[in-house]
Amino acid sequence: MAGKKAPYGEFAGRKLKLKRKKFRWSDIRYKRRVLRLKEKSDPLEGAPQARGIVLEKIAVEAKQPNSAMRKAVRVQLIKNGKVVTAFTPGDGAINHIDEHDEVIIEGIGGPKGGSMGDIPGIRYKVVKVNRVSLKELVKGRKEKPRR
């Protein structure tokens, strides 16, 4: 006859606690959180936003069944020198961004911190250009400061 798996009894609390602690390591989400793997691999280093310099403007092809060229920029982050691609949301938003502009980027809001919708491999979006909101620039409410 097979024995019982869990320790039962009045004083089994410590043993149960230790057992639970041991088996938590097989949970991937727990492991990634405790070992801080996201912050270590994330270009933004766990921060909600980051500042960077625009290196070039690019167009990325949308995934099937859509057909479009999604406008994006390659940005070099100031804090660690890493280069990431950031989407420029809004109609004609790319026209308000030039090379060597200072931009603020943030996550695009896809599942599990990944890319969103039909834009493949792009995890970030541009929020501000030269300290002015990109949304305001696109709507024509504000003008980009001349340097």
Swiss-Prot record:
Organism, as annotated: Thermococcus kodakarensis (strain ATCC BAA-918 / JCM 12380 / KOD1) (Pyrococcus kodakaraensis (strain KOD1))
CDD domains per record: Ribosomal_S23 (cd03367)
HAMAP family: Ribosomal_uS12_A
GO annotation terms (biological process): translation
Known role: With S4 and S5 plays an important role in translational accuracy. Located at the interface of the 30S and 50S subunits.
Protein name: Small ribosomal subunit protein uS12
Gene3D superfamilies recorded: Nucleic acid-binding proteins
Subunit structure: Part of the 30S ribosomal subunit.
Keywords, in A-Z order: Ribonucleoprotein, Ribosomal protein, RNA-binding, rRNA-binding
Family: Belongs to the universal ribosomal protein uS12 family.
GO cellular component: cytosolic small ribosomal subunit; ribosome
Molecular function terms from GO: rRNA binding; structural constituent of ribosome
Pfam short name (any one): Ribosom_S12_S23
InterPro entries in the cross-refs: NA-bd_OB-fold, Ribosomal_uS12, Ribosomal_uS12_arc, Ribosomal_uS12_bac, Ribosomal_uS12_euk/arc
